[in-house]
Amino acid sequence: KTLNTLENNATITSLLYLNEKDKFNKNLIQISTYTRNIYGIKKLENGVLNVLPISEITLQHIDEWNYSMKNFSDSVISKSFIQLKRAFDIAMDKQIITRNILKNYKRAKSSKKTKKVSAFTITEQKKFIELIPKSKYYMQYMIALCTGMRMGEVNALHYNDINLKEKTININKTISRDSNFKSFINSTTKTKNGTRVIPLNAILYPIIKDFISDKKGKYLFSNDNVISTSQVNSEMKRLTNNLNYNTHMLRHTYATRCIEAGIQAVVLKKLLGHGDISTTLNTYVDVFDKYEKQNNIIIENYFKNNLFLGGDN
């Protein structure tokens, strides 16, 4: 039975919007989380799921929606399905429905091909570095290439985040979007593990030292206007005359060069701010596989020289 007429007519999205607004007003979630959740809810706005009251939704309706989502990425499907399940949980709590038809329901798998990680080859990277000095985002490009930082983290850097004495960068903020999709500097990173201190390498050190000399007490890039990742992406496409290029490639390029140099996955995980090493391994599985044979030869030679053929103890 329903509690009242209003709830009896509640749709999936109306329940979800009210729930997110309530959590945000109670300071239970950050604005960046609120914005991401709202984006997931919007994928439920089109079609029968947003027309009928949730109490009238049947498994057939869910099946139709599920099928319609197959051309989206697994990430989009997963986020939308999480919101869908949440709506039915809310409806159960409010006694709007008496049975949760999604209790054991499985979401659709995406029919889209999984995009492999894109990174510059060494030749492409050299060409890009030769190209960027003329760009207004030169420093952002160089920082991303030399550290693997997300572009949102780069654009949120403050003078105080650069420690020239210790040669480190303190990553503790990012650029997020509010409920109106306007960019702002978020006082926390994308994830808990995104907050990290990374080394300022010898290539980047002299460049950034010169750049920040007149930036004391200021944000390095986002002072009068916050610079969003999409702005830098657009400029990168124009600069390279390649619509397939984006700034996340710079992060992947850094990670790829690290793997090529022999850096262990557990170290790379910390540098990139991944929460779980499986994220690092799964994201760069092809790159790790490429160098597996080389690593096997290194292990083989080590065994020969140190363990089985009279090597030093």
What is each residue range found by the language model?
Residues 166, 177-179, 185-195, 202-204, ...:
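C-terminal secondary-structure termini that scaffold catalytic or DNA-interacting sites
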Residues 130, 134, 147, 198, ...:
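Short, basic (Lys/Arg/His-rich) helix/loop patches that form interaction surfaces
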Residues 56-59, 89-112, 172, 297-300:
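Short, charged hinge/linker segments at domain and secondary-structure junctions
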Residues 156-162, 269-275, 285:
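A short, basic/aromatic helix-end/turn motif that makes direct DNA contacts
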Residues 21-96, 226-231, 244-249:
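N-terminal core-binding DNA-recognition domain of tyrosine site-specific recombinases/integrases
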Residues 111, 175, 205, 272-298:
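Catalytic-site neighborhood detector that most strongly recognizes the C-terminal catalytic loop/helix
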Residues 78, 93, 97-99, 103-157, ...:
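Basic, Lys/Arg- and aromatic-enriched nucleic-acid-binding interface segment
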